Amino acid sequence: MSVKINGIEFGNELFPNNERIFKSLPWQICAQNFIRVDFKYQTDLDIWKLIVAKKYLDDKFNGTVIVLNMLYVPYSRMDREIEGYAFSLKYFCDLINGLNFHQVKVLDTHSNVTEALINHLYKINVQDFVDKVIEKENPDYVFYPDSGALKRYSEAIKLPENIGVFYGNKQRDLNTGKILKFELINCPEDIKDKNVLIVDDLCSKGGTFIASAELIKNVGAKRVCLYVSHCEDSIFDGKILKTDFIDMVYTSNSINRSGSSEKIYEFCI
């Protein structure tokens, strides 16, 4: 599922030439004052399906309140102008704004740049999900992989007073993406046999989190778990699920994944 209208899948069939088939919906599905469009990005094709869905709804149900539920915002990594690259996040957000949804619901954007670029934005509170993980894992410390995550989550979530905080610093080869160096900043002296929860917004293959967890366990931590709001399918290609550095991954259902693992616990939104 990549696009649903009030729970009904839209545009999932194909003509022989691979063009999408967009069937009209039963009028009863949208015979109300509110329509919810759920959008889960997998490929750029899904963006086309979203465009057709909104244009169709505008034609057939003009005047109805239409809300976009887009928990993960595509292209959120490209949140600044970088020489040699197109500012793709801005152009994607321009497209969403042009569709003129009454409200756009998102979860844990990669940066405040995304929030500034999308009109009629509603942020789902990440605090609720972090609280659930804390209740399950009872961590002694929360670890943020970099200073950006430290700043973002220090403002977005409130931790119990008994949970300490430290963070990481990494040097990355911008051409290859490979992590060249990783270090722990303000690592607590009493971390031996303690539980640590890593918190961030997005996981792909998880190289940063493996580097973090390996160092944290090497200095004596007993258990290291990870909370990410968005977990891409590529986690199955990385080392997180194949090694013992990270004991459990907590995430949302914001992105479709082709597989499953006993080490992944999913919150449904």
Where are these regions (language model features)?
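PRPP-associated nucleotide enzymes
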Residues: M1-I269
